[in-house]
Amino acid sequence: MPVAKVQAVENRKSFRTKTLRLHPLENRTFDQACEALNDMERTQLMQEAVIQEAARLGVRWTVEPAAPLTSVWPYLPQRGDEPTQVRVSITVSLPVAEIITRAAEHVHASEPMFIIGATLAHIGRLKACFKGIHADTPEEARDIRAALDRIKLPPQYQYPRRGRRRR
């Protein structure tokens, strides 16, 4: 009998797979961002994005629910009539999967649309604010920022650049 119990535990998964249907522009944008960030894996980029956006919205591990939105979530992708052409899957941990579900419900979006919108917004923030202070060299940081700058985003995901600090 103990063998059956051990076997049941071994079959449990610590992750969930999320399938996304992307427009070619979204797919290209995600590829460019991953390449700019020293070939970061797409799943990692998207997990960072959804965690950051969920926290920004107040969706986090707490007993208090997030305050209701006072306006429409601005990062919901505007798809129009153009059909999606690219299907991708990402793998997320169980806690991240739960955060995605809670955040998507909070903004009244499907989980895939929340993931896509949060990731596009994250790329916009990286373009505007990423400094590369942990890059191996100043040249590498400059290359990463330049590659991020070349990414074209729809207007709703563009952020004003922060000015340089004056000393």
Tell me what each language-model feature is.
Residues 19, 47-48, 89:
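Σ70-family region 2.3-2.4 aromatic/basic alpha-helix that recognizes the −10 promoter
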Residues 15-21:
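N-terminal coiled-coil initiation/transition segments in long coiled-coil scaffolds
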Residues 55-91, 95-98, 102, 124-167:
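Short, positively charged interaction helices/loops
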Residues 11-15, 81-84:
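Short glycine-enriched loop/turn motifs at secondary-structure junctions
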Residues 1-13:
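Arg/Lys-rich, low-complexity, intrinsically disordered N-terminal tails that contact nucleic acids
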Residues 37, 52-53, 57, 121-122:
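The DNA-recognition helices of helix-turn-helix-type DNA-binding domains
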Residues 9-10, 23-44, 48, 94-113, ...:
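Surface-exposed, Lys/Arg-rich phosphate-binding patches that contact polyanionic backbones
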